[in-house]
Amino acid sequence: MTIALGKFTKDEKDLFDIMDDWLRRDRFVFVGWSGLLLFPCAYFALGGWFTGTTFVTSWYTHGLASSYLEGCNFLTAAVSTPANSLSHSLLLLWGPEAQGDFTRWCQLGGLWTFVALHGAFGLIGFMLRQFELARSVQLRPYNAIAFSGPIAVFVSVFLIYPLGQSGWFFAPSFGVAAIFRFILFFQGFHNWTLNPFHMMGVAGVLGAALLCAIHGATVENTLFEDGDGANTFRAFNPTQAEETYSMVTANRFWSQIFGVAFSNKRWLHFFMLFVPVTGLWMSALGVVGLALNLRAYDFVSQEIRAAEDPEFETFYTKNILLNEGIRAWMAAQDQPHENLIFPEEVLPRGNAL
């Protein structure tokens, strides 16, 4: 018996093939299948943010002015979170809260959920775009893997944290000063700076900045003299096939400086990928812990001794008192719907005050 093996070919293209040909066509701006998610979501997220910061007040949700129309500037304008009473409602325009009224929807904070959800899916679409392009040109997918770090931070801070709390109200509003307020809130209510996951995140981000600076400077230092131009950009032909810097020279230099150095480019560049991405993932995990109100380090023995001994105080006990002050002041300011009043005699005073 003879078996003929051959590649099956379709006589005519179906709708999927036609779509695939159009989406993945070589053009100035690649679209791709990921673009069906990325471009609409990015458009709506940015459009919602510009609309909110320009026109929409936060008076009904936070008792604040938050738009250019009310006199805010770029640093103080924001798309603010919905009121605490709305809990975790998706605040759909056609939902029971707004009932199709666009003005009412904006007043209730519907733009925040709109921007947050479209922003999250837009970021995921951008990561899928990197996967798709990498596969098209037969590259490894490390760019997309690296971009998972920012996505993890965004999703944990803007979605998972408020889901663990009483409502979207406790998520960050989309604005510069609003993010600063959220950072102060995290410190006062969660002692975030003493959280080991935050420490790993800081080490990752600052360590990555250091590695980036060292790497860029080292490459510039060991460039081959390939031309007589006045600067790096004029002296080199960007299409030349050979390397433009000496890994051997760089290795000898850092071996003398530190006693150790990267021996090959793969390990060096993997380390530059690993440090920031791991840091971002660790801080995202820490925020998930805070969503569940998990505590980090509590040095109770120092707190007890500071309470008993007027002359004993550490930077830790000082910070604990500062956190109490943030909570006492911030709760009344930040949650006006609770009508909280703290008389001066209950506000914290350290031993040194």
From Swiss-Prot:
The modification Phosphothreonine is found at residue 2. The keyword Cytoplasm does not apply. Chlorophyll a ChlzD2 binds at residue 118. Pheophytin a binds at residues 130, 143. Fe cation binds at residues 215, 269. Chlorophyll a PD2 binds at residue 198. It is a multi-pass membrane protein. GO terms for molecular function: chlorophyll binding; electron transporter, transferring electrons within the cyclic electron transport pathway of photosynthesis activity; iron ion binding; oxygen evolving activity. It is an enzyme of class 1 (oxidoreductase). The keyword Lipid metabolism does not apply. Its EC number is 1.10.3.9. PSII is composed of 1 copy each of membrane proteins PsbA, PsbB, PsbC, PsbD, PsbE, PsbF, PsbH, PsbI, PsbJ, PsbK, PsbL, PsbM, PsbT, PsbX, PsbY, PsbZ, Psb30/Ycf12, at least 3 peripheral proteins of the oxygen-evolving complex and a large number of cofactors. It forms dimeric complexes. This is Photosystem II D2 protein.
